[in-house]
Amino acid sequence: RICPRILMECSSDSDCLAECICLENGFCG
């Protein structure tokens, strides 16, 4: 999957860019 390496806080996958998912630590990855 394509995920830009940008540190973004998230509460769900929809908060993240491209194909990033919301990880357990509260950030996209």
Swiss-Prot record:
List the SMART domains hit by this protein, alphabetically.
Answer: PTI
Which Pfam families does the UniProt entry name for this protein?
A: Squash
Per the record, its GO cellular-component terms are: extracellular region
Q: Does the keyword Secreted apply?
A: yes
Please list the disulfide bridges.
C3-C20, C10-C22, C16-C28
Q: Which GO terms describe its molecular function?
A: serine-type endopeptidase inhibitor activity
Q: Which residues form a coiled coil?
A: none
Task: Please name the InterPro entries in this protein's record.
Answer: Prot_inh_squash, Proteinase_amylase_inhib_sf
Which residues does this entry assign to the site Reactive bond?
A: R5, I6
Per its UniProt record, what SUPFAM superfamilies does this chain match? Plant inhibitors of proteinases and amylases
The alphabetical list of record keywords is: Disulfide bond, Knottin, Protease inhibitor, Secreted, Serine protease inhibitor
Q: Tell me the PROSITE patterns matching this sequence.
A: SQUASH_INHIBITOR
Compartments where located: Secreted
What task does this protein carry out? Inhibits trypsin.
Its family remark reads: Belongs to the protease inhibitor I7 (squash-type serine protease inhibitor) family.
Give the domain section of the comments. The presence of a 'disulfide through disulfide knot' structurally defines this protein as a knottin.
- The molecule here is called Trypsin inhibitor 3
- The species is Luffa aegyptiaca
